[in-house]
Amino acid sequence: ADRAAEWIGNYDGKKPFFLSYGMYATHRRFPDVIDRDINEDFVLPPGPIPDSRETRKDFARYMTSAKSADLCVGRVLDTLKEKGLTEETVILVTTDHGLAEPFCKCTLYDSGIGVALLIRAPGKRANGHVVDGLVSHLDVFPTLCDLLGIEKPGYLEGVSAVPMLDDPEAKIRDEIFAEVNFHTSYEPIRCIRTERYKYIRYYDASYLRINQSNIDESLTKDYFNERGLKEQHKYEEALYDLVFDVGERRNLAGLPEFGTVEKALAARLDRHLRETDDPIRNGGISVLPEWKVNRKECLTASSKNPEDYVSAVNSNRKRS
């Protein structure tokens, strides 16, 4: 943050600038020492994390890391303001995935794919407002092009979100698509999400348990493991009603009363896979010999046991 602020402070205004600034916070490992303004006895872990002594402590450490990130962003924004550049600058803050917690990061639940996206653009009505419409990270590039008056390359697949910046009630998408292939072990998943429903498909039927190496080590992971995480089952297909099941815990796939919805979403997902030539349709992604990939059964990503690693992918479902 200091280096980014220093660069802005030295900006001479002779030509437009682009500055990309990334932070380690809020990645694990979170700080062991909890900020004095955060009381671990009075924090509430977000769903799908249970409320317990262990998870509260873990989340308090996350909040300490998040506070550091907030202060760093504030340092940069304050420097823009001091230089008189705020009203001439497009500001975008985002993250790449959900919290590094079980059932969050490296999943296609909303707790895994729902991320922060803050955009402030000069003169836009939505500045300072929450916009509820669906947006994908694919939309960032065309949005910036429109805001800056730059011609959009023809290969872009995203949709400009400028209409949402002009009108917080505007919608630019009926659906978004998301995927997982690897974190440390192979776990191919695809989904389609609309405002009301989400349909998820797991493509590795050979292992329908939780890929534990794809979950970062933490007090929260320990809490789940002590209560049977290894025995938890994954569905090959899942359908969730995001209005009446915000936590995505009641799988509606296969229920006759939701058959029409499931069939329609599955067809839309299949069409997307064809249009994007997704390799999952032809057996998945092969692991090259030089890659280091955890076995699906491995419990920790940092295992020192050579038997916990593989160099081949087995048992993928093929879809047309």
Functional labels for PLM-detected ranges:
Residues D2-I8, L44-T89, K124, L147:
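A long, amphipathic alpha-helix that forms part
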Residues R29, T79-S136, S302-D308:
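Histidine-centered active-site microenvironments of extracellular/periplasmic hydrolases
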Residues D58-C72, T107-V115, R125-P142, L148-S160, ...:
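A short beta-strand-to-alpha-helix junction
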Residues L99-E101, L148-A238, V293, D308, ...:
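C-terminal cap/loop subdomain of S1 sulfatases and analogous C-terminal strand-loop tails that border
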